[in-house]
């Protein structure tokens, strides 16, 4: 019979593996070659390298996210500024008719004094502060980007230059945006270069000198005639 309290042999069914981790072989006395994975600290070095790679990857992801956010922020600010400019331009455009009425009143002398003058001055000051600029004056060069010609005098031949002769309605510009083109009448003028102008001036000077010489000669002749008449006759 088998005793129920008999303990099983500790060596039965179990295999014990003993690993000699000594770096020096006790039999040969030489240093053993240990694979990197089996060296003490080899696992730690591999973990450190893996950690560095992971940190570099996460750092690159963070930098990319930061760049994307910076671009988004710039785009949002740009869109916000564009929306504000459109709203401001829309409001100012509604007041251009009021400015036209005030300009007509100014030409008739109705804004020389009184409460209306104060209102007009304050409105002009406020719109100027917003960046509103009026353009279109007689004598300015005609610019099709800013001006709309409703009249044209001249043949527009070679050497001519179109300038504004009359202004029917002023134009307005808010920043770089043209809110309204100026209605103008265009007159073609002849462009004279510096050489032609100098030659014309020289010719005028020569003509003036010749006229002065002729006048001096005439005065000298008159003087001699008067002296001859004033001298007594020898007979």
Curated annotation (Swiss-Prot):
Q: Which UniProt keywords apply?
A: Chaperone, Cytoplasm, Stress response
The record's section on NCBIfam families has:
PRK14142.1, PRK14164.1
Query: Subunit structure, briefly?
Result: Homodimer.
State where composition is biased (Basic and acidic residues): 19-35
Q: Say yes or no: keyword Ribonucleoprotein present.
A: no
- Protein name as it appears in the record: Protein GrpE
Q: Which GO terms describe its cellular component?
A: cytoplasm
Q: Which GO terms describe its molecular function?
A: adenyl-nucleotide exchange factor activity; protein homodimerization activity; protein-folding chaperone binding; unfolded protein binding
